[in-house]
UniProtKB/Swiss-Prot annotation:
<dbReference type="GO" id="GO:0003712">
    <property type="term" value="F:transcription coregulator activity"/>
</dbReference>
<comment type="function">
    <text>Weakly suppresses a RAD53 null mutation when overexpressed.</text>
</comment>
<dbReference type="GO" id="GO:0005634">
    <property type="term" value="C:nucleus"/>
</dbReference>
<feature type="region of interest" description="Disordered">
    <location>
        <begin position="49"/>
        <end position="68"/>
    </location>
</feature>
<comment type="subunit">
    <text>Interacts with CLN2.</text>
</comment>
<feature type="modified residue" description="Phosphoserine">
    <location>
        <position position="212"/>
    </location>
</feature>
<protein>
    <recommendedName>
        <fullName>Protein SRL3</fullName>
    </recommendedName>
</protein>
<dbReference type="GO" id="GO:0000082">
    <property type="term" value="P:G1/S transition of mitotic cell cycle"/>
</dbReference>
<feature type="region of interest" description="Disordered">
    <location>
        <begin position="200"/>
        <end position="229"/>
    </location>
</feature>
<dbReference type="InterPro" id="IPR039198">
    <property type="entry name" value="Srl3/Whi5"/>
</dbReference>
<dbReference type="GO" id="GO:0006139">
    <property type="term" value="P:nucleobase-containing compound metabolic process"/>
</dbReference>
<dbReference type="GO" id="GO:0000978">
    <property type="term" value="F:RNA polymerase II cis-regulatory region sequence-specific DNA binding"/>
</dbReference>
<dbReference type="GO" id="GO:0005737">
    <property type="term" value="C:cytoplasm"/>
</dbReference>
<keyword id="KW-0963">Cytoplasm</keyword>
<keyword id="KW-0597">Phosphoprotein</keyword>
<feature type="compositionally biased region" description="Polar residues">
    <location>
        <begin position="49"/>
        <end position="61"/>
    </location>
</feature>
<dbReference type="GO" id="GO:0033309">
    <property type="term" value="C:SBF transcription complex"/>
</dbReference>
Length: 246
């Protein structure tokens, strides 16, 4: 009949007292051997286990040769050794002694030929870029070493329009001469030159220079009369133009 190992927490260590175990409560009609086995205290079980270890061939014999009967081997209390627990890791180690290869998805698989071609293309691209950078640096150095072309300075003549020359960016003397000749041909430029070189403006400049304080009043009168005459002339000109336009 199969018997379960007694629960040592429920068994009392004193040999005189007898405690009912779970097996006795479940099936009280057990034989005497099973009752004695279940009611055995824990101290006696430990003594028999020590005697079993001494009787084993690996253990050294006692020096006296006389063994205590309490420590003799008892077949009733022989239990097998502990079973090593099996975990998924140990099972995998037993079933697969060699290391498992890394998992690779089929879409991520790349052929070796493609790898070689990509590497070669990247190397050639890098070499081309390096060559282009070297060429550009050499060209910049050559441009910096070349001296600028000589430019002729424009000599000032009787009249030179600096603003027009800057706007036109006349780098040579011929271009500046052509530009000035084109300005002289235009009617607006001719009218501007006439206004500058008019006799009336020259006379005013001469009169205004070196005037004594005694002649200030007379100078003011003459200036006012001249302004009035000029206003009359301008008014007459405007009236004539308006009549001609009508």
């Amino acid at each position: 009949m199969f018997l379960k190992t007694p629960n040592w927490e429920t068994v009392n260590e004193t040999p005189k007292s007898r405690v009912l175990t779970i097996n006795e409560l479940i099936s009280p009609n057990l034989d005497t051997e099973s009752n004695s086995l279940l009611a055995t205290p824990a101290r006696k079980y430990f003594k028999t286990s020590i005697s079993e270890a001494q009787d084993s061939p690996t253990s050294a014999p006692s020096p006296d040769g006389n063994e205590d009967p309490t420590y003799q081997y008892n077949v009733q209390f022989h239990f097998p050794g502990p079973i090593t627990p099996t975990t998924p890791r140990s099972k995998n180690a037993e079933m697969f002694p060699s290391p498992t290869p890394p998992l690779v998805s089929p879409t991520a698989v790349i052929e070796e030929e493609n790898d070689d071609s990509v590497r070669e293309f990247s190397r050639t691209l890098k070499s081309r870029l390096n060559c282009a950078m070297v060429k550009l640096s050499k060209e910049h150095e050559q441009v910096a070493l070349i001296p600028p072309p000589p430019t002729e300075k424009i000599r000032k003549g009787s009249y030179s329009n600096k603003f027009a020359a800057k706007h036109r960016r006349c780098h040579s003397l011929d271009e500046s001469k052509k530009f000035l000749s084109s300005l002289e041909d235009s009617s607006a430029h001719a009218a501007f030159l006439k206004a500058i070189s008019s006799k009336h403006a020259k006379s005013n400049r001469v009169d205004n220079v070196n005037v004594s304080p005694l002649r200030w009043s007379s100078h003011r009168r003459t200036q006012s009369t001249q302004e009035n005459s000029l206003q009359e002339v301008v008014a007459i000109d405007t009236l004539l133009k308006m009549s001609s336009s009508d």
